[in-house]
Amino acid sequence: MAFDGTWKVDRSENYEKFMEVMGVNIVKRKLGAHDNLKVIIQQDGNNFTVKESSTFRNIEIKFTLAQPFEYSLADGTELNGAWFLQDNQLLGTFTRKDNGKVLQTTRQIIGDELVQTYEYEGTESKRIFKRG
């Protein structure tokens, strides 16, 4: 699958504002904007393994498409949700455990980049990754 591989964050759009709307404090927002995130994605049929490594943490997430699972963001925000594959895009719908609000996430390959889009409470952000 096209998502397989190692991806390093190259640039972000509106990411600090997105983190602010998510309730991340200013210190963590400033640090998060420069986290040097690297993502390794491996797909085996409907099963995915995603390894994230950054300045703040290293984590491995395993999930099966369309199957709910729990996940914690780098700031500790806990979510429940699932990923779906549609039109060569990974679409994630996650609900925050603390307030019940929904975070939408999309991962898609555009050209030679992995574009990850977040939408929360009307605020959209993108993180663009290059193979690395």
Curated annotation (Swiss-Prot):
It is found in: Cytoplasm. The modification N-acetylalanine is found at A2. Signal peptide: none annotated. Transmembrane segments: none annotated. Hexadecanoate binds at W83, R107. CDD domains: FABP2. GO terms for biological process: fatty acid transport. GO terms for molecular function: long-chain fatty acid binding. Pfam families: Lipocalin. InterPro entries: Calycin, FABP2, Fatty_acid-bd, ILBP, Lipocln_cytosolic_FA-bd_dom. FABPs are thought to play a role in the intracellular transport of long-chain fatty acids and their acyl-CoA esters. PANTHER family: FATTY ACID BINDING PROTEIN. Belongs to the calycin superfamily. Fatty-acid binding protein (FABP) family. Forms a beta-barrel structure that accommodates the hydrophobic ligand in its interior. This is Fatty acid-binding protein, intestinal. It comes from Xenopus laevis. The lineage of its organism: Eukaryota, Metazoa, Chordata, Craniata, Vertebrata.
